Amino acid sequence: MYKVEDIKTVHLEVTQRCNAACPMCDRNENGGAVNQHIRGNLKELSLEDCKRIFPPEFIGQLNTMYMCGNLGDPIVAEDTLEIFRYFREHNPKMWLSMNTNAGARTTEWWQELASIFGRMGAVIFSVDGLENTNHLYRQGVVWEHVA
């Protein structure tokens, strides 16, 4: 039987919101409106939620924390940087990682994320094409923010 002490990796979905409307995503209806089954019920974890769910002693036992949404993108969540900072503060040696479409933040935001991650983290960018084709798959993504 597993115990809380055995948990070494957390996959955290901080938001169900997304800046994109990708046709292949279950979050929306064929690249259009938000799926009727989640519309009006889009939620987001705040820094305070994460502090309540993940006490410092629990964070201290982790090796890895990933942010990747099934229905959202962590870059649109209000407290993403603060949540990463909280995890880093309580475990400087853990690996931090995030998957994103990359199309919703400024250079300054990315620089702040890099300073939190340091050499113990990575961002996986989901870019599906070049400037003239990415929008076919990642609808709603601002190419200038990606490039």
Where are the regions a protein language model picked out?
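Conserved alpha-helical substructure of the radical SAM core
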Residues: 1-122, 133-145
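A glycine-centered beta->alpha junction motif in the catalytic cores
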Residues: 127-131
